C-alpha cells in the first residue's frame, strides 16, 4: 500500500506540469488586455504600456512561462496583478471559507442522500421509494443559482430568518450549504439506492435473514458496508466537485471564497491568481482520488494495491 501511495504521489509531477502548461496557454488566450483593465478606461497608450512592462507582459510568451514555472516549483506563484499581494496570501485568505462551506454541504448531503437512498432501496417500488426519488430528481434538475435566489427570497427577504451575505457566523452557512449540497444529496440518494438494490439481492443477505437476524441489522451491518465501495467513489468525486465548483453559489451569496476569487480574477484577467487556483483545484482532485483508493482497502480488506 505504501509503495502504491508513493507511486501515485510521484505521478503528481507530470500531471501538474501538463495542467500548468494548459492553464498558462488558456489564460493567455483569454480576450482582453489585463494591462488596460488595470490601468483603467481613462489611461492612454503610454500608461498602458508602462503597466504592461511592470507586469512583465511585454516579455515573450516562452520567457513568461519559464519565469512562471520556475517560481511555481519553489512555491512562489507571484503577485496578483490587481491587488499586488502575493497570490499565496490571496488564496490562503479565501481557502477556509470555501473549505468549511464544502464540508458543511457535504456532511448534510451525505447524511440525507444516503438515508434517502437506503430507504428507497429497502422499500423499493413503494411510496417511500417514489417520494425519495422524486425529491432526488428535483434536486438534480433545479439549477444552483435559481435555488439560491429562491432561498434568499424566502428565508432572508420575506421571513428575515437568515442573513444573505457574509461568512461570519454559523447562520451564514445555512443557505449556501443547502444550495451547494442539494444536487450532491440528490446524486448520493440515487447512487446509494442503485448500489443497495444490488446488495439486497445477494446470497449473504438472504443467509443473514434466514439465520433470524433483524432486518435493521441486516441492512446496516451486511448491506451498508458492501454497498459503500461505489458510494465512496461518488463521495470523493462529489467532494472534489464541491470544493472546486462552488463558483455559482459563492457568486450568488457573495461568499468570500475561492470560487468568487476565481470569477473576479477571470474578469480582471489576473493571470497569476487564475493559474494558481486551477493548479490547486487539480491537486485537490488528484489527492481526493488517492484518499478514495486508500478507503477502498479500509472498507473491503479483499482489495489490495501493488
Swiss-Prot record:
InterPro entries: BPD_transp_1_N (IPR045621), MetI-like (IPR000515), MetI-like_sf (IPR035906). Coiled coil: none annotated. The chain crosses the membrane at residues 9-29, 103-123, 135-155, 169-189, 229-249, 278-298. Its main location: membrane. SUPFAM superfamilies: MetI-like. GO terms for biological process: transmembrane transport. It is found in: Cell inner membrane. Pfam families: BPD_transp_1 (PF00528), BPD_transp_1_N (PF19300). Residues 95-292 form the ABC transmembrane type-1 domain. It is a multi-pass membrane protein. GO terms for cellular component: plasma membrane. PROSITE patterns: ABC_TM1 (PS50928). Residues 30-102, 156-168, 250-277 are periplasmic. Residues 1-8, 124-134, 190-228, 299-306 are cytoplasmic. Keywords: Cell inner membrane, Cell membrane, Membrane, Transmembrane, Transmembrane helix, Transport. Part of the ABC transporter complex GsiABCD involved in glutathione import. Probably responsible for the translocation of the substrate across the membrane. Belongs to the binding-protein-dependent transport system permease family. The complex is composed of two ATP-binding proteins (GsiA), two transmembrane proteins (GsiC and GsiD) and a solute-binding protein (GsiB). PANTHER family: DIPEPTIDE TRANSPORT SYSTEM PERMEASE PROTEIN DPPB-RELATED, GLUTATHIONE TRANSPORT SYSTEM PERMEASE PROTEIN GSIC. This is Glutathione transport system permease protein GsiC. It comes from Shigella flexneri serotype 5b (strain 8401). The gene is gsiC.
